[in-house]
Amino acid sequence: MAYYRTPHDVTALPAWQALKDHRQAMQDFSMREAFNADPQRFSQFTLSSCGLFLDYSKNLITSETRDLLVNLAKEVGLSDAIKSMITGELVNASEGRPALHTALRRPVGDKLSVNGVNVMPEVHKVLNQITELVGRIHDGLWRGYTEKPITDVVNIGIGGSFLGPELVSEALLSYAQKGVRCHYLANIDGSEFHELSAKIRAETTLFIVSSKSFNTLETLKNAQAARAWYLAQGGSEAELHRHFIAVSSNNAAAVAFGIREENIFPMWDWVGGRYSLWSAIGLPIALAIGMSNFKELLSGAYTMDQHFQSAPFEQNMPVLLALLGVWYGNFWGAQSHAILPYDHYLRNITKHLQQLDMESNGKSVRQDGTPVATDTGPVIWGGVGCNGQHAYHQLLHQGTQLIPADFIVPIVSFNPVADHHQWLYANCLSQSQALMLGKTRAEAESELREKGLSEAEIAKLAPHKVIPGNRPSNTLVVERISPRRLGALVALYEHKVFVQSVVWGINAFDQWGVELGKELGKGVYNRLVGSDETLADDASTQGLINYFRGRHRG
């Protein structure tokens, strides 16, 4: 029976009990001692694939730990689950849908049936549609209402229609095509629109409205604001089609807005928003970096898909990262996971992975609606490397919580300045080393003696300088951030999230919690503007409504 129809209680599996027993045996495990005892530890716990090099040797694991985690993956039926997702079974059980983001990066000639229909020709038809549009804009053939070529593209979207495309277009800024600047408008806060509109000219700007329903509140409000601004700047209704296109499955609403049907790029219900950057949602990426680079991005993701499907679990990068997350979250009590990119252009990867991981695995019931028996997805947080060292790394080193971390770093910089990149890389490695090694009381006291402190001063200060160490981390190294490697990196985390959902028996492809907030928001809005005079369901919300109404002007 398919895993998504009859999810297991993972805590009842023999492999889970074996891991519980092993966790007790690992209570006094020391990474420092493990490295001293085994010169081959690094080679035993490293892996290279798809242009990525993973060092997972700085973890609270032995080869036995890895074997036990792999046994867990086998007992939960991970191989069948991977096949179910890739082949289009209804792995999104609550919505009765497949999750086929992997289809978006499959090559021409592949076949994949959904409800008896081969979807691959349609996938590549849309890719050709994107290619044509990108070519026209880059060649200056798409012109605005004053016949000037387009110089600025504004993507209006939120969530998956924003976070993934923004990550990729900024991460690949070194591949940006000259002549077209890409911007993102997501927040309904008017200040964001105000700042953006000051940077662009209506006559040379193309807006992409990205919303599957063409009814997402924030996106629709921003699209309406952009439309009003365009008209106020001298644009006309008759020429509006030159400045607005859409990525949506609601053609009627997009046409009613003023967008021509041939300029509406389709979305499919078998691709979730947080997995959609590979689709027409990635149009701003293609406009930013060019079509050949966009196809390289897809190709990189496809190589990771192939690795994920074919590599044995012991050598499978997404599977290993996922199982390590299960190990810490379910057996060591970790509640969060830090993403620490040591690359300026990857500064938004944490935001994308927050949505990817937390919206996917922030669940408390299994696929069949029964409560989970263990913790599920962690809080994902972090930020750019060296900046974080002077902010929150202190908590990683000496705080009371165990927080696993992923360090992500390139070997080559696109913008070398003196020896800056060598220092950047050194900082990345030294942080993971410090988390692992820590500093003992004896080492702290020895340092203070060398500085000439008295024994009384040493006794007072040494406890503050002790760093526990034994804090786990992974290090992902890429030679250089490229479209192909970035595609593999993002796909790596997509598959990691899926593997964990299979272990926990949850649905990684729905997000009902998000829907509740949307529903309640309408009622609060109606009370704020006075169109609904009934009281809110609770005194706190009503009190805050009254506070707003008593003070808001304009």
From Swiss-Prot:
**What is the purpose of this protein?**
Catalyzes the reversible isomerization of glucose-6-phosphate to fructose-6-phosphate.
Q: Which residues cross the membrane?
A: none
According to UniProt, the name of this protein is Glucose-6-phosphate isomerase
PROSITE patterns referenced in this protein's UniProt entry, alphabetically: P_GLUCOSE_ISOMERASE_1, P_GLUCOSE_ISOMERASE_2, P_GLUCOSE_ISOMERASE_3
Superkingdom of origin: Bacteria
Keyword Transmembrane helix annotated: no
Kindly list the organism's lineage: Bacteria, Pseudomonadati, Pseudomonadota, Gammaproteobacteria, Pseudomonadales
Organism this protein belongs to: Pseudomonas fluorescens (strain ATCC BAA-477 / NRRL B-23932 / Pf-5)
Q: Is the Transmembrane keyword given for this protein?
A: no
Its pathway, per UniProt, is:
Carbohydrate biosynthesis; gluconeogenesis; Carbohydrate degradation; glycolysis; D-glyceraldehyde 3-phosphate and glycerone phosphate from D-glucose: step 2/4
Q: Which residues form a coiled coil?
A: none
Q: Where in the cell is it found?
A: Cytoplasm
Q: What keywords are assigned to this protein? A: Cytoplasm, Gluconeogenesis, Glycolysis, Isomerase
Q: Name one GO molecular function term.
A: monosaccharide binding
Task: State the family named in the UniProt similarity comment for this chain.
Answer: Belongs to the GPI family.
Q: Which GO terms describe its biological process?
A: gluconeogenesis; glucose 6-phosphate metabolic process; glycolytic process
